[in-house]
Amino acid sequence: MKPTSTGGRPVSPDAETVTASDVGRELRRLRKAAGETQAETARIIGVTRANLTQWETAKYLPSAHNARQLDDHFRAANALFKLVEKARSPQEHAAPAAGDAGVVDTSRSLLQVFHTVGAKLAEHLIHDADGKPLGWRHNLQKNTGPKALSTAYGINTMLVVGDPYIDLHTLSEDLYRLQSAHGWRGRAGGKRPETTASVVDALFRTSTLSADEGLERLEGSLDPYSRTRPYLLSAVLHTAVRLRPDAPLTDRLIDALLAARLDFDGSRLWPEKNEAGLVAPEASVVHTARSVVALRDVLRSREDRNDVREAADEATQWLIDRSHSDDGVAEDLERPRPDGEGTTRIIIRHFTAAWVVQALANAPRLPLPRLNRALGTLWERYDADQGLWVWGSGDLPIWQTLDAVTALRAAALAVAVPPLSPPGTP
């Protein structure tokens, strides 16, 4: 039995199957019954009108957090929230596999999204007066010049979506020439291990940099401050594993990342930072997810680190058990100035949902309801008109699209069933 909504009749969450279309119809019914426009409802809930339109037209489902807010706002007595969660959960109405007799509409497929991302990033590429590609800016809707870090993000995004559209070799060679004595610096100058890690990753993947030189650059970008920040350690470890999983630097980074955990009610997890003098720090979803992703990278190449497996499994279970929404967060990095005159404050934003999706997709046993919840939050930030992912402020940060497509690729490969996975796969 499939739920229906005709006129003012509500859609029941107790029906045998519930789809995103059912959620959209019910949300539209409730909004009209309240006498609100899309813009008014979106403002009350704290999302964009485009988000609400996507929910009502069944493009995406609201996250658990937004579903709860909508339910409370329309006084739906938990019915709307249950409807969203039912639509998000695995049901018998899954789309036919590639080998079935049915025909699948690919106009809204992940493949098409990836094609769109590649084409849109190619449009945002900055060129000089002679047409030579220079790179990308950090915030794609601004009118600033290209940066080393954002160009590395753009190259890596093109590699993930699989359609370069541009000459990546020329970009990579120019990016290589931008290095300084301590690797590649960000806008504030000084040592920036996260910047160097992203650039080395892009250059190595485009065969512009050797593994040995990459490891040397990673080593030179680190300092004692890096050991207190799980974000920095996990970013550098991710690249070091790609270069050489058994390198001495890789082992040191693994040990440092494991040492950065704190005990939270008997579970060893990652906070935003681990330094002396902290008062009641909390476990961080995004830092734990980022660390898990880096450690799973290690486990794909190494079987001699049981401590890594135990740490990843423990943290993954905590991520699965989390019931809060996977909203984006910001982190302050206070780095010493290159001239020694004080410090420079750097704001790092994290696309939490994308990292949770990656962490779950790499788990030995994938919990689909939890994955679907994180994916719902991820898709809420996709702007179909731009073909890219948008931060809540309205910015178009290139790194957010990289995180999104990387997560979606991992999830798509993880949940593939026969005939897109080996016969006999459960």
Where are these regions (language model features)?
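Short alpha-helical DNA-recognition segment
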Residues: K32-Q54, Y60, A64
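Intrinsically disordered or compositionally simple regulatory linkers and C-terminal tails
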Residues: S5-G7, D14, P90-A101
